[in-house]
Amino acid sequence: MIRKAIESDKKAIYHMWKEIFAQDDNGYTDYYFECLFKCENTWVVDDGGEIIATLQRNPHTMYFHGMPIKTSMILGVATLPSRRKEGHMHALMREALKQAECEEMITLIQAYDPSLYKEFGFSKIYYRNRIAYHRNQIPVYTHLEITSEVKAEELANVYQAFTKRFDGFFVRDRAYYENYFKEISAEGGQIVGYRNKNGELEGYMVYYTEKFTCEIKEIIYLNSWAFLALAGYGATKCMKVMIHTSSSEQILKLLPGGEVTQYQFAMARVNDYSIFNILFDTSVQNVEEAFEICTRPLFLHEYA
């Protein structure tokens, strides 16, 4: 039977994640179950007391076309290998989306295999770029302005200012960044900020180093100098630098010579087109058309 999770299910769900998502773990699973897991956001398939499948739907506030709206991210869709192809994923998705249709306009999903979710009305909407540089391609400025001493409230303020040029993004607050610190630490990463001459934070980046590569998973900046100072700091760490950004940011204009690879990040679903069209005074008929009403480029970098 399908039901909401209870506290005694947590251990079984945790072990399912550790087995099924082992290739992408890097400490994230432990962080997630310590800081983000909530039973009220979790569905399970219970077969005689054994948890054989699960998914989670975490609520967020999205800023969409000039207004904040409720949304959620579906993640952690998992079935025990021995119980696959029995329809459990489909049943869980139908149950979760039935509730989503009553609570929110748009639902997102992190999809390992996007083809599995098209039948539920999801379409590929969010993309990100991965830009590869050799350290010699990045000018290294003095990093006296780079600091590891950054506060959650400062980061939230910088993110809020940065996202004014975007649409379709999740709202972040101080509590988000307090958890973000824990996530970065759990996965072996670092976060540093850039301060101007007045000591004001004007950007930050989250990066991970492995062998010869510095991977900048998130870089948020209020001006070109902040971006260049942070990227230059990354170039002091390793021979290769990989910078992840939204697909709309014109990074090559700031830092030419990089090799750009675009990848799909998240899918989206409109839960009720009639209400959507009334609310936004449109006549859209599919997800792509719904997001095309946004007058600014999309930004999203939440996994949960």
Predicted regions, residues:
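Residue-level detector of beta-strand face positions
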Residues: 42-44, 108, 191-193
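Conserved acetyl-CoA binding element of GNAT-fold acetyltransferases
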Residues: 69-81, 212-223
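Conserved acetyl-CoA-binding loop-helix of GNAT-fold acetyltransferases
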Residues: 76-79, 85-98, 109, 221-235
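Active-site/acyl-donor-binding loops of N-acyltransferases
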Residues: 122-139, 217-224, 231-304
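Amide-forming acyltransferase catalytic core, primarily the GNAT-like/NAT-type
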Residues: 123-220, 224
